[in-house]
Amino acid sequence: ARNLYTEQTVAELTAMLAHPKVIATGETGLDYYWTKNEGNALDWQRARFRTHIAAAKQTRKPLIIHTRNAKDDTIAIMREEKADEIGGVMHCFTEDVAMAKAALDLGFYISFSGIVSFKNAKVVHETAAYVPMDRLLIETDSPYLAPVPHRGQQNEPAYVRHVAQAIADLKGMR
């Protein structure tokens, strides 16, 4: 097995993305939640993210981007690397309206998971209410992040209806 920390080149990723069954690039992005910058771990993440964007653009396979505790760097890199040329989805989105606006301006869709149904997820509630319906997606992120009323259980695709209901409630839809 390959070491997870082995650097993949754009050429290697492009070759993998060229497979006809591959329809998107990712999940990629930045997650600073658990990472300290020991051994330049953040630099490593940023470099890999840039590599993934380059490969996505070369193969015309949209990006599936995850970001956690890294919104400024994520948007900066998306802009610098011209991710708007390929577009994609901001997966399991938990950031604020400002970041959603920036991602929408770059042509990305915003996807919400079961977190949007959590009472304490006020920032996610505000963001879901803001995102236009034609740019909003729902997901399970299964087996994690089961929505209320299944919070704490293993998530499954059937629960996505609770994500949809939570968003409909936030948008005042009946």
Predicted stretch roles:
Residues 1-174:
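Mid-domain alpha/beta scaffold segments of enzyme catalytic cores
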